[in-house]
Amino acid sequence: QAGRTIRYNLKYGGDYRFMSFRSLLLSGNMVDTQFCYHELPEKLDPFDNETFMHSKTKFYAVCSNVETGSPEYVLCRDMFKDIDFLRASASMPFVSQIVKAGGMKLLDGGITDSIPLTAAFKLGFERNIVVQTRPEGYRKKPARTGWLAKMFYGKYPKFVEAIKQRHLMYNRELDEIEQMRAARRVLVIRPSRSVKIGKMEPNPEIVREMYELGRYDAIAVLDSVKKFLQGDKNEKG
C-alpha cells in the first residue's frame, strides 16, 4: 500500500483525534485509540490485512513491559487481532495509557530497546537493514524526565530505571551498529541531512518534507540494499 502512511498523515493530521493535547485530556491518550487504531485502518483508509496475513515476511512489534522493565518482541500475524500490541509499541510514556495485551502491561518499545538489531539477529535474521531517523554522528543526551517517570510510574521501578537509562542503552546500540556496519554485517540507512521535526509534529509541510527526504535517501541506496540482501559481503552501507 505504497503512500498510505503519508496519505492518512496529511489527510487526518489536523483532526484532534489523530494526535493532540485535546485528545490527551479527553481520552487519556495523545493518540485517540478508537480513531487511529480502529476507525482509520478499518474504515477511513483500510489496511490490507488479507495481504498482510498471507505475507511470508514476519512482522514484530517491540513493546516495553512496564512491570519487568524489559522489551517484548511480539510476532503479529493478524494486524486487526494484534492491533493492541502495535498500539502499545507506539504508546509514548506520559502521554499514553498503559496498554494491557497478552497478559502484560505495555508501552513504547523504544524505551527498553530503541534499535532492536541484536534482537533481530537472535530471532534468526542474518542480513539486517537498520533505518535510522537521525543523521550520522547523533548521540542521545540524558533525559530530564526522571522525576516525572517516578511520579507517573512509581509502581514500576524497573520501568522508571529504563527511562532514566535510555540514553545509555541508545548510544550503546549506536556503537554496536557502527561496529557491525564496519564488519559489513548490517546495512545502515540514515537521513542525509537534519530536519527539525517534533515527535508529534503538527505541521503538514514538515511531515511532507521528512517523507520526501526519506524517499530520496532510500532511492539513493537502493542498489546497495539489493546487493546486500543478495549476499554481497563487500557492500557496505
Language model: regions and residue ranges:
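Flexible, glycine/proline-enriched loop segments at strand-loop-helix junctions
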Residues: 23-31, 70-74, 104-107, 161-164
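C-terminal domain-closing interface element
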Residues: 31-54, 168-176, 190-193
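Active-site gating loop/helix substructures
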Residues: 53-131, 135-150, 231
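Helix-centered, glycine/charged polyanion-binding patches within enzymatic domains
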Residues: 126-185
